[in-house]
Swiss-Prot record:
Medical condition linked: Cerebellar ataxia, neuropathy, and vestibular areflexia syndrome: An autosomal recessive neurologic disease characterized by imbalance, cerebellar ataxia, impaired vestibular function, and non-length-dependent sensory deficit.
Cross-link (Glycyl lysine isopeptide (Lys-Gly) (interchain with G-Cter in SUMO2)): 50
Positions annotated to bind ATP: 650-657
Alphabetical list of PANTHER family matching this protein: CHROMOSOME TRANSMISSION FIDELITY FACTOR 18, REPLICATION FACTOR C SUBUNIT 1
Biased composition (Basic and acidic residues): 46-56, 234-246, 288-308, 323-353, 362-376, 496-507, 520-538, 1130-1140
Gene that this sequence comes from: RFC1
Protein name: Replication factor C subunit 1
Residues with PTM Phosphoserine: 69, 71, 73, 108, 156, 164, 173, 190, 253, 281, 283, 312, 368, 537, 1104, 1106
Length: 1148
């Protein structure tokens, strides 16, 4: 290939680019791009008229300009051409508005391959040191002459000049496109003047350009300019900068905001920035060069951004240094700037934009190699935590005995492995003396107990917060030296008891001094407490009766009898009340008497207060919203439950649901009927009981004076333990309850433990949902300590803490345990309370997923579990627990393997063998009903696999897939049996043969006509089905069974129109089948075996004859459908009926 042809393509390509840009076409046609990439002959055809005119003026230089050569004559011609453009440059710089009409733009804006080749060729030629001989220079000189004739701006021919490698990677200044053009022009002139003998005019021009370049370099070495360029690079990458651009902010506004922020943060640098701006604006040389290109620069931001990316190595390194300085200076000045912002409110709006740009580097730094390395180290630390050893010198140090409550009020955090004590022992030791152990370090933490292989994050946080760090010996020394304290709970109870004793003393004095109470006090007392008001009313009525009765007696006798009678009655009442109180259980003795005394329900948004507000507004809301359905109240914006006619209190047992409901009704004056699990709550009984309760009145109201005013007409129904409404006795109870709620005229309060129970899900939509949570340990502890103080029990607070945790924060269970354990002795130690609470730990119902997780769990959760405890996990549900173990044991990473794959596989093999042995035991239990083997199955199916694979599960426990596969196996077996029966007259084969040989062929034969012919093949398929006596259900079953590996059936891929046509065609016709479509009735009575054989034969003959008659009868034929008689009588029957009546009446 001739190299001249290779270089001849480039200038013509450039000419084409200039022509298309001059026409202001946004998109180029495919023909022009193809022609630009083809040979020289096509390019000559596309040459413009200006080029032809120029060639006519210079006929001697035609071919030499197009093709490169190394001859000396061509060099001299190029030198002469190089001198022409500088002479004509000042002439073309006069017009200022031509810049808008100038079609020539910067080369980097176009995405054409020709321009890229031009740049590449230019850079290569300059590297070889032959830039003066290149054709690019000559072609550009030629274009400069054309531009002078058309009077274009001076920068337009320079924009099309070739750019060298030095312009991109050399010492050139970082600036927009016009700066590069200056640098390239300077180099071109310098090379040409060296060869032409250094003309005086060229030297002068070159000196001026050198001065301009030096000035540019000095201006652009400013730190403020480098920072602005860095911000320009960062802005489009950050999200916040995009919001600014969407809002319409220009680069100038960002730069202005930056300058304002810089005035506050960098006052010593503002002057240099101002000087540089003045130099840029007032230098005459820059004004002359950039006046014509100001408007074009505003419209070419995209090209300027591209050019800004191409910078020299020195400038890029300088930018990196500037960024580092900037970050360090921001870190130092940020606190000072924050203080200034508080003082100067006016400047807040100005400093917002720089903050947005400064936040972006922090986001970039988050995804860095340092972060990935940090994650790797954290993962390695976690792996080492899982495989770390226990205490090496267990029990080597003597544990001291400290004073009582010596650590009360102190909070500890334990990290690492303690050498002589296990973590649980250290925790119980701290709690024994009143301390508290938490999991994470916070400001409230007093001591961090650090051991071997401690957590780095906890130690760093403790050092940052100034928390004291001690070791194991420091903890023991702390217990040994700290003085004892009196418990804060005991102090609170003592003060409370003192207040109560003072209040009790003062009313007694008043009663003794003034026996008669004023009516105002009567009213206040009746408002405060209803029981006391009732007692007072009873006493008053008795006094009135006695006054009337003793009118005739003397005053002295009357007084003596009254005092003696009062003292006797008082003594009898006191004795009886004391006996009753002593005989009461603690749960009834200390049961709350008001809403304020319910533990954990003191807040304004507590469930008790919500229920009180709901019941108070029930009459108003029910009268207003009669037409609205209750279920739509779920979507109302209010949280007061005003649209619901019933409330549902759900929560764990022993948290005060029933107590709250009864106290709320008492406070608002509602009489209530309570139905719990001991009552029959079926559909019929609910109707009767609720209907009766609506018309009831309480007898208590008739004892008082104002019987009519005190009797309440407000009733409520309390349904306790709604989730227990099951079985035959309560059949239909939930549905009847929902019906009652829809049409009730009294409030209904329901209670349950398990809100997610299937029966409760339908009830939830009609009730105001109130979920009770377990009270905190501190809340329960305070109330229990006061009760213990009243009963004279001496229990340390840590012991009470263990009792509460052992009862799973069930207040009722805590009171029962206290009354039982303190029946013998009135003192209870910490160790005794912990042992008793562990023995009497409340059984918590666990689901199968929790059981599966706990079987394989490692660590503190299962460290102290005995063999019996591990086998008890199996007995939570012995029918499904083995399936959960078999499904999830492969998802466990065992600790015993230690990351070794071979050990892991060995453990998996041994666990699988144990599960197989458990399955053998299960088959013996189920087949021979040998239920005594269940403990052996627990060992094989649960305990052994759990011990071998004890570790950490990689995912949540999955449900056993065996259950779904087993049900589908039974279903498929029934389907194949039905198909074998239906096709038996055609195939004469067994169920296995049909499954193995017939089904796959039948599937293809039934689907093939529909896929190939479409709607036309429907009749063929229906005929084939009739041939084999197949129904529509059999067709679907064949498609389902014959598809393997979860692949979709071929029938599902058909066009819906074809499927619809097939269904219509099959349903249109009647299909005869040799088998009954309905269930055949069972045979009639069979004779007893005690009869004689002859008699049996006779009976059989009679039966056979009768059976033949029955078979012949149309009515008994199962293949013939009977017509159902219409319920409406026919016309003649209607006519006959009155005639019969008339006849009877006439006869009478």
């Amino acid at each position: 290939m001739d190299i001249r042809k290779f270089f001849g393509v480039i200038p013509s390509g450039k000419k084409l680019v200039s022509e298309t840009v001059k026409k202001n076409e946004k998109t180029k046609s495919d023909e022009e791009t193809l022609k630009a990439k083809k040979g020289i002959k096509e390019i000559k055809v596309n040459s413009s008229r200006k080029e032809d005119d120029f060639k006519q003026k210079q006929p001697s230089k035609k071919k030499r300009i197009i093709y490169d050569s190394d001859s000396e004559s061509e060099e001299t011609l190029q030198v002469k051409n190089a001198k022409k453009p500088p002479e004509k440059l000042p002439v073309s710089s006069k017009p200022g508005k031509i810049s808008r009409q100038d079609p020539v733009t910067y080369i980097s804006e176009t995405d054409e391959e020709d321009d890229f080749m031009c740049k590449k060729a230019a850079s290569k030629s300059k590297e070889n040191g032959r830039s003066t001989n290149s054709h690019l220079g000559t072609s550009n000189m030629k274009k400069n002459e054309e531009n002078t004739k058309t009077k274009n701006k001076p920068l337009s021919p320079i924009k099309l000049t070739p750019t060298s490698v030095l312009d991109y990677f050399g010492t050139g200044s970082v600036q927009r496109s016009n700066k590069k053009m200056v640098a390239s022009k300077r180099k071109e002139l310098s090379q040409n003047t060296d060869e032409s003998g250094l003309n005086d005019e060229a030297i002068a021009k070159q000196l001026q350009l050198d001065e301009d370049a030096e000035l540019e370099r000095q201006l652009h070495e400013d730190e403020e300019f480098a920072r602005t360029l860095a911000m320009l690079d960062e802005e489009p990458k950050t999200k916040k900068a995009r919001k600014d651009t969407e809002a319409g902010e220009t680069f100038s506004s960002v730069q202005a905001n930056l300058s304002k922020a810089e005035k506050h943060k960098y006052p010593h640098k503002v002057k240099t920035a101002q000087v540089s701006d003045e130099r840029k604006s007032y230098s005459p040389r820059k004004q002359s060069k950039y006046e014509s290109s100001k408007e074009s620069q505003q419209h070419s931001k995209s090209s300027a951004d591209k050019i800004g990316e191409v910078s020299s190595p020195k400038a890029s390194s300088k930018l990196a240094i500037m960024k580092r300085k900037e970050e360090s200076s921001y870190k130092e000045i940020e606190p000072v700037a924050s203080k200034r912002k508080e003082n100067a409110i006016k400047l807040k709006g100005e400093t917002k934009t720089p903050k947005k740009t400064k936040s972006s580097p922090a986001k970039k730094e988050s995804v860095s190699p340092e972060d990935s390395e940090k994650k790797r180290t954290n993962y390695q630390a976690y792996r080492s935590y899982l495989n770390r050893e226990g205490p090496k010198a267990l029990g080597s140090k003597e544990i001291p005995k400290g004073a009582e409550n010596c650590l009360e009020g102190l909070i500890f955090v334990i990290t690492g492995v303690l050498e002589s004590i296990e973590r649980d022992e250290a925790k119980s030791l701290i709690e024994r003396y009143g301390g508290k152990v938490t999991g994470n370090v916070s400001k409230k933490t007093n001591y961090l107990v650090m051991g071997r292989d401690s957590g780095q994050s906890k130690s760093d946080k403790a050092a940052a917060l100034g928390t004291k760090i001690i070791d194991e010996d420091g903890l023991l020394n702390l217990i040994r030296t700290m003085p004892g304290k009196k418990s804060k709970y005991e102090i609170a109870v003592e003060t409370e008891m003192k207040k109560e004793s003072k209040l009790e003393r003062t009313p007694q004095k008043n009663v003794q001094g003034k026996r008669k109470i004023s009516p105002s006090k009567k009213e206040s007392e009746s408002k405060k407490s209803r029981p006391t008001s009732k007692r007072d009313s009873l006493a008053k009525t008795i006094k009135k009766e006695t006054d009337v009765f003793w009118k005739s007696l003397d005053f002295k006798e009357q007084v003596a009898e009254e005092t003696s009678g009062d003292s006797k009655a008082r003594n009898l009442a006191d004795d009886s009340s004391e006996n009753k109180v002593e005989n009461l259980l603690w749960v009834d003795k200390y049961k709350p008497t008001s809403l304020k005394t319910i533990i954990g329900q003191q807040g304004d948004q507590s469930c008790a207060n919500k229920l009180l507000r709901w019941l108070r507004n029930w009459q108003k809301s029910s009268s207003e919203d009669k037409k609205h359905a209750a279920k739509f109240g779920k979507f109302s914006g209010k949280d007061d439950g005003s649209s619901f006619k019933a409330a549902l209190l759900s929560g764990p047992p022993g948290v005060g649901k029933t107590t709250t409901a009864s106290l709320v009704c008492q406070e608002l004056g509602y009489s209530y009927v309570e139905l719990n699990a001991s009552d029959t709550r079926s559909k019929s009984s609910l109707k009767a009981i609720v209907a009766e309760s609506l018309n009831n009145t309480s007898i208590k109201g008739f004892y008082s004076n104002g019987a009519a005013s005190s009797v309440s007409t407000k009733h409520a129904l309390i349904m306790d333990e709604v989730d227990g409404m099951a079985g035959n006795e309560d059949r239909g109870g939930i549905q009847e309850l929902i019906g009652l709620i829809k049409h009730t005229k009294i409030p209904i309060i329901c209670m349950c433990n398990d809100r997610n129970h299937p029966k409760i899900r339908s009830l939830v939509h009609y009730c105001f949902d109130l979920r009770f949570q377990r009270p905190r340990v501190e809340q329960i502890k305070g109330a229990m300590m006061s009760i213990a103080f009243k009963e004279g029990l001496k229990i340390p607070p840590p012991a009470m803490n263990e009792i509460i945790l052992g009862a799973n924060q069930d207040i009722r269970q805590v009171l029962h345990n206290l009354s039982m354990w303190c029946a013998r002795s009135k003192a209870l130690t910490y160790d005794q309370a912990k042992a008793d609470s562990h023995r009497a730990k409340k059984d918590i119902k666990m689901g199968p997923f929790d059981v599966a997780r706990k079987v394989f769990a490692a660590g503190e959760e299962t460290a102290h579990m005995s063999l019996v405890d591990k086998s008890d996990l199996f007995f939570h549900d012995y029918s499904i627990a083995p399936l959960f173990v078999q499904e999830n044991y492969i998802h466990v990473k065992p600790v015993a393997a230690g990351g070794d794959m071979k050990k892991h596989l060995m453990l998996l093999s041994r666990a699988a063998d144990s599960i197989c042995d458990g399955d053998l035991v299960d088959s013996q239990i189920r087949s021979k009903q040998n239920w005594s083997l269940l403990p052996a199955q627990a060992i094989y199916a649960s305990v052994l696999p759990g011990e071998l694979m004890r570790g950490y599960m990689t995912q949540f426990p999955t449900f056993p897939s065996w259950l779904g596969k087993h049900s589908s196996t039974g279903k498929h077996d029934r389907i194949v049996q039905d198909l074998a029966l239906h096709m038996s007259l055609r195939t004469y084969s067994s169920k296995r043969t049909v499954n193995m040989d017939y089904l796959s062929l039948l599937r293809d034969a039934l689907v093939q006509p529909l896929t190939s012919q479409g709607v036309d093949g429907v009749q063929d398929v229906v005929a084939l089905m009739d041939t084999y006596y197949l129904m529509k259900e059999d067709f679907e079953n064949i498609m389902e069974i014959s598809s393997w590996g979860g692949k979709p059936s071929p029938f599902s891929k058909l066009d819906p129109k074809v499927k619809a046509a097939f269904t219509r065609a099959y349903n249109k016709e009647a299909h005869l089948t040799p088998y009954s479509l309905q269930a055949i009735k069972a045979s009639r009575h069979s004779t007893s075996p005690s009869l004689d054989s002859e008699y049996n034969e006779e009976l059989n003959e009679d039966d056979s004859q009768s059976d033949e008659k029955d078979q012949d009868a149309i009515e008994t034929d199962a293949m013939i459908k009977k017509k159902t008689k219409s319920s409406k009588p026919s016309k003649p029957e209607k006519d006959k009926e009155p005639r019969k009546g008339k006849g009877k009446s006439s006869k009478k």
